[in-house]
Amino acid sequence: GKLNINKESIKGVSMELSGKKAVVFGGTSGIGLATTLLLAENGAEVTAISREPKKAGALSNGITTRACDVLDRGAVEAVLEELSPIDILVTAATGGKRAFGPFLEMDLDGYKASFDKLWGYANVVRYGAMHVSDGGSITLVSGAPARNCLPGQVALSSVGNAVEAMMRAVAREVAPRIRINAVSPGTIDTPMVIAKGTEREELYRQMTTNNLIPRAGMADEVAQGILFVIKNNFVTGTTVDVDGGWLLREP
């Protein structure tokens, strides 16, 4: 027989983005830029925030831009208050430096500086949550090393773990009014990698050769993962991996 679907019973399963107010920290480059453009394409009114004023003024297509450093707590608080109320809050801002190499040989000041990403996210979540509307969402970008740390990635792993732990703890505090999730990318082709041409291709080949999908991902693919956790109203307190099988790779 014909399947009868009660549309009222599934109403609200997915957030409609048309007319929703979205704020994307780190929204003018890499994964953040891809997210900004995808949200705008889906009808959201997007404000992209960057610590570099030149980048912040480079977008068009109805996308608003603001300059703000996520490590400047007062500036973060002010810009979020200005943009309130917010339906969708995303932070993909790196916030600081990245330290690589064996922990026992690592400059501990460099290791400490890596945690600026966490403090930037903490500022955005702490001051953003009070301006997110009922039924809204917050999404953080972590990273695959959080749960599969390869040699030399202790700083990335530590910071990623801290970001995801904060997300899970905050999810309990803000539920059911707000949902908060993390999206964890693997190796992604973004401007953060300085190498060019064949050197860049070889670097990505070496980094992904043991992945189940042996290539670097694209920022647009991560943005699709971010869009998923934003739109699905039954997802909170979780991490969605967009990593080409990084977590299942052989050492």
Predicted regions and their residues:
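N-terminal Rossmann NAD(P)H-binding glycine-rich loop of SDR-like oxidoreductase domains
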Residues: 28, 36
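A glycine/serine/threonine-rich, flexible loop-to-helix segment
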Residues: 187-210, 249-251
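C-terminal substrate-recognition "lid" of short-chain dehydrogenase/reductases
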Residues: 215-242, 247
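Conserved mid-core segment of classical short-chain dehydrogenase/reductases
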Residues: 94-110, 194
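Rossmann-fold cofactor-recognition segment
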Residues: 60-74
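Rossmann-fold scaffold of SDR-type NAD(P)-dependent oxidoreductases
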Residues: 25, 86-95, 140, 181-185
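Conserved Rossmann-fold SDR core element
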Residues: 164, 173-189, 235-242
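Catalytic loop of short-chain dehydrogenase/reductase
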Residues: 102, 108-123, 130, 137-175, ...
